[in-house]
Amino acid sequence: MTKKEIEKNYKKLLDQNLNLDLTRGQPSKEQLKLSEPMDQILKNKFNFDGEDLRNYGLIKGLDSTRKLGAILLGINYKNVIANGTSSLNLTSMVIQALFFKGINGEAWKHYKKISFLCPVPGYDRHFSLLEMMGINMINVPLRGDGPDMDYAEKLVKKDKSIKGIICVPKHSNPTGETYSLKVLERLARLPKKASKDFMTVSYTHLTLPTNREV
């Protein structure tokens, strides 16, 4: 299909004035009701870790929450930030910090071109965020067990404008596939093959134990 044909088909879709809700993962009303008792769990006990939970929180989050995260991640709690429930907001904060402050190099705003590897199919809101920041997106196809790492490694070796990869290793959105251990190991080593300020943005939700397991 030519570019002209694609643009023609795209215009046909626009002309339909569709208003579709493509949001995924929204809980049903029945599921939302399950969390209602949590509203009363504090029972007027608002002090924790020496902080009044009704007031503005600490920038890095409560120490107790960070220590719990450290246990789950197997790292020092000082390397954990507990901040809100929106991973997309956190990703935006990280990318903006890299743009204006940088890490292991210059601030990204000083580079003529910044690129990110994007496993596809992928999460549309990740792509929208990168597009908004003016970041060039390079597609890396998913293969059923994660992205094509041969291709990803080849790209980062030859193109130093590539400063990161954004991915969802567990139940990837929208395909649902989970990256294999082999792919995860190569993904972890990717920064060593890339530019010194390469950043891996990994959306991974941890499987917490159930009450029965506890």
Predicted feature residues:
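Conserved small/polar residues in nucleotide/adenosyl-binding loops
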Residues: 204-210
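Short, internal active-site loops enriched in acidic
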Residues: 26-28, 86, 206
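N-terminal "arm"/small-domain region of PLP-dependent enzymes with the aminotransferase-like
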Residues: 1-71
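Feature marks short, surface-exposed loop/turn motifs that line or immediately flank catalytic pockets
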Residues: 26-29, 171, 210
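Conserved core of the PLP fold type I
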Residues: 51-197, 201
